Curated annotation (Swiss-Prot):
<comment type="subunit">
    <text>Homooligomer. Homomultimerizes to form the nucleocapsid. Binds to viral genomic RNA. Interacts with VP35 and VP30 to form the nucleocapsid. Also interacts with VP24 and VP40.</text>
</comment>
<feature type="compositionally biased region" description="Acidic residues">
    <location>
        <begin position="529"/>
        <end position="547"/>
    </location>
</feature>
<keyword id="KW-0167">Capsid protein</keyword>
<feature type="short sequence motif" description="PTAP/PSAP motif">
    <location>
        <begin position="603"/>
        <end position="606"/>
    </location>
</feature>
<feature type="coiled-coil region">
    <location>
        <begin position="372"/>
        <end position="400"/>
    </location>
</feature>
<feature type="compositionally biased region" description="Polar residues">
    <location>
        <begin position="474"/>
        <end position="484"/>
    </location>
</feature>
<dbReference type="GO" id="GO:0019029">
    <property type="term" value="C:helical viral capsid"/>
</dbReference>
<keyword id="KW-1035">Host cytoplasm</keyword>
<keyword id="KW-1198">Viral budding</keyword>
<keyword id="KW-1188">Viral release from host cell</keyword>
<comment type="function">
    <text>Encapsidates the genome, protecting it from nucleases. The encapsidated genomic RNA is termed the nucleocapsid and serves as template for transcription and replication. During replication, encapsidation by NP is coupled to RNA synthesis and all replicative products are resistant to nucleases.</text>
</comment>
<protein>
    <recommendedName>
        <fullName>Nucleoprotein</fullName>
    </recommendedName>
</protein>
<feature type="compositionally biased region" description="Basic and acidic residues">
    <location>
        <begin position="502"/>
        <end position="516"/>
    </location>
</feature>
<dbReference type="GO" id="GO:0039702">
    <property type="term" value="P:viral budding via host ESCRT complex"/>
</dbReference>
<keyword id="KW-0175">Coiled coil</keyword>
<comment type="similarity">
    <text>Belongs to the filoviruses nucleoprotein family.</text>
</comment>
<dbReference type="Pfam" id="PF05505">
    <property type="entry name" value="Ebola_NP"/>
</dbReference>
Length: 695
């Protein structure tokens, strides 16, 4: 036994085994309708499970063989699939018009049947099958790279085909979610990949627009994931008139051994015949013997030589320890090119003048090719670096923003303290609702950054979004009410808490920590929670006054406007009750939910410096506003058509009848988050901000 054969043991199968797989084909008299319903089910994201391969093969048989089972059974496709271990099981149901009628009545298919019952299909066009198959083929060229690269490539191809007027795909097919579904199906379905590749190569007549797209995509898929094979065959194993010659750079003994092993791996790959260029996409046997890491020096030299010849496809990364070898091979190949060109010019030039012209041309050509190649490679590296940085920034921003939101919502939900009945400009009655600034969190913001500050504002203040920070709030001077009752003194602990929070927030604003800079792009965006805050109406509020109430679906509902409460209750004896109901434990109509209370979060509370010890209490005749630009009150119309007087309707000592009706109605019929967004008043953000600053 040759001892050196030990090195190759285990690289070739000695007892080849093929796993048997059953594929269900569907045969009806309404095959086009069934195929369209299969496409609709896939587009809807329904998981067909083990029926997926059969459904896709049914589409292919309908498109290429017009559902002629005899033609398909005698085709090379069926023979290859049988050799690969696939067994075809045909389900015949001539009268079936819906896909769910041909599914076997077995228990594990019951969820699929239930999902298909809700699916409505009105399409019955045969051309839609080819449209779907051609759309799937767009993902083949970059399938082995990853979903992002594959989707980007598919979108570029879609743009090209639309500009050429070949075919136009439905818009909802081009969404990222749908394209990820198709990518996942193509990645896992061997049958679909194989049939598309086989027909893309072998279909020579009867082409329509969809078949030409499939052939074009298959042509771009050749040697996908087999860059080392392509570069070595083109630049290292050079084909000449006298045979195959090794490149001078790989004639050393150590690299020669790698070349011999590579030739053996190539001979194994060549057994797959016409499918060998697609071995990586189809995951054929022997493909694992062609990795770059198995031939490190040969791979580095081949990529360096390919780059010297202007191949930008060779801009992949090699191992760090072989990067210098690659660059050395690149420089050596450039010098060898110049030498060969010089020798050729000496042989073909008839005089010195022609020789000089040819030498100058070839020198310029080599330099131009070299510079262009390096420019393209540097652009690719910059693009990769930008993408990596963008992904990291997005991850960091999402984590920081979600953490800050979670801190606010959790502290807001877990704090059982009832609302203090004092009217203050921005009195902070829950110290836990504002976490102190933490490094590497979104709390590091600038004073103008109203969008990021909206993630941790006082959740009881509907106008808290519209104030950029404490400084803006303190600088906005408001006229006091003409009719004042005796002011209530603010407790000392509350004052200290406010001063502490304000100082902490100012320290966070003045921080120069670099983590703060990565969130500066929030400045140019509208407020993140703008569409989630409460609207200014009094007759369409969706939550109660209790800080512990929360929606079952996890939607943070905004609080309603708060009214004057005639009976003051002791907060210690009557703590707020936490409830999972979006409107709290409303009980009956005569419950506490409809008894208004006064709160600092009332949007009509006059704003003043928080350092003053006074507080104002609203009265029904509170009508003094310092505003010369608009006439108050004004009528506001919401998108649902509700009208109300602003701010008069917010200043009543008892809620209007419309609010009582709306609360009872919406308690019985809870609204969704989308309906909440649709119930905003028809006012722009600047108008809302102007309203808030001029109350």
């Amino acid at each position: 036994m040759d001892l050196h054969s030990l090195l190759e043991l285990g690289t070739k199968p000695t007892a080849p085994h093929v796993r048997n797989k059953k594929v269900i084909l569907f045969d009806t008299n309404h095959q086009v309708s069934i195929c369209n319903q299969i496409i609709d089910a896939i587009n809807s994201g329904i998981d067909l499970g083990d029926l997926l391969e059969g459904g896709l093969l049914t589409l292919c048989v309908e498109h290429y063989y017009n559902s002629d089972k005899d033609k398909f059974n005698t085709s090379p496709i069926a023979k290859y699939l049988r050799d690969a271990g696939y067994e075809f099981d045909v389900i015949k149901n001539p009268d079936a018009t819906r896909f769910l009628e041909v599914i076997p009545n077995e228990p594990h298919y019951s969820p699929l049947i239930l999902a298909l019952k809700t699916l409505e299909s009105t399409e019955s066009q045969r051309g839609r099958i080819g449209l779907f198959l051609s759309f799937c083929s767009l993902f083949l060229p970059k399938l082995v790279v990853g979903d992002r690269a594959s989707i980007e490539k598919a979108l570029r191809q879609v743009t090209v085909h639309q500009e050429q007027g070949i075919v136009t795909y439905p818009n909802h097919w081009l969404t990222t979610g749908h394209m990820k579904v198709i990518f996942g199906i193509l990645r896992s379905s061997f049958i679909l990949k194989f049939v598309l590749i086989h027909q893309g190569v072998n279909l020579v007549t009867g082409h329509d627009a969809y078949d030409s797209i499939i052939s074009n995509s298959v042509g771009q898929t050749r040697f996908s994931g087999l860059l080392i094979v392509k570069t070595v065959l083109e630049f290292i194993l050079q084909k000449t008139d006298s045979g195959v010659a090794l490149h001078p750079l790989v004639r050393t003994s150590k690299v020669k051994n790698e070349v011999a092993s590579f030739k053996q791996a190539l001979s194994n790959l060549a057994r797959h015949g016409e499918y060998a260029p697609f071995a990586r996409v189809l995951n054929l046997s022997g493909i694992n013997n062609l990795e770059h890491g198995l031939y490190p020096q040969l791979s580095a030299i081949a990529l360096g030589v390919a780059t010297a010849h202007g191949s930008t496809l060779a801009g992949v990364n090699v191992g760090e320890q072989y990067q210098q070898l690659r660059e050395a091979a690149h420089d050596a190949e450039v010098k060898l090119q110049r030498r060969h060109e010089h020798q050729e010019i000496q042989a073909i030039a008839e005089d010195d003048e022609e020789r000089k012209i040819l030498e100058q041309f070839h020198l310029q050509k080599t330099e131009i090719t070299h510079s262009q190649t390096l420019a393209v490679l540097s652009q690719k590296r910059e693009k990769l670096a930008r993408l990596a940085a963008e992904i990291e920034n997005n991850i960091a921003e999402d984590q920081g923003f979600k953490q800050s939101q979670n801190q606010v919502s959790q502290s807001f939900l877990n704090d059982p303290t009832p609302v203090e009945v004092t009217v203050q400009a921005r009195s902070i009655n829950r110290p836990t609702a504002l976490p102190p600034p933490v490094d590497n969190k979104i709390e590091h913001e600038t004073e103008e950054d109203s969008s990021s500050s909206s993630s941790f504002v006082d959740l009881n203040d509907p106008f808290a979004l519209l104030n950029e920070d404490e400084d803006t709030l303190e600088n906005s001077v408001m006229a006091p009410s003409t009719t004042l009752r005796e002011p209530k003194e603010v407790s000392e602990p509350l004052r200290q808490t406010q001063d502490l929070d304000i100082s902490q927030k100012k320290q966070g604003n003045e921080s120069t920590d670099p983590a703060r800079k990565q969130f500066l792009r929030y400045q140019e965006l509208p407020p993140v929670q703008e569409d989630d805050e409460s609207e200014y109406t009094t007759d369409s509020q969706e939550s109660d006054d209790q800080p512990g109430s929360d929606n079952e679906q996890g939607v943070d509902l905004p609080p309603p406007p708060l009214y004057a409460q005639e009976k003051r209750q002791d907060p210690i004896q009557h703590p707020a009750v936490s409830s999972q109901d979006p409107f709290g434990s409303i009980g009956d109509v005569d419950g506490d939910i409809l008894e208004p209370i006064r709160s600092p979060s009332s949007p009509s509370a006059p704003q003043e410096d928080t350092r003053m010890g006074e507080a104002y209490e609203l009265s029904p005749d509170f009508t003094s506003y310092e505003d010369n630009q608009q006439n108050w009150p004004q009528r506001v119309v919401t998108k649902k058509g509700r009208t109300f007087l602003y701010p008069n309707d917010l200043l009543q000592t008892s809620p209007p009848e419309s609010l009582i009706t709306a609360l009872v109605e919406e308690y019985q019929n809870p609204v969704s988050a989308k309906e909440l967004q649709a119930d905003w008043p028809d006012m722009s953000f600047d108008e809302r901000r102007h309203v808030a600053m001029n109350l």
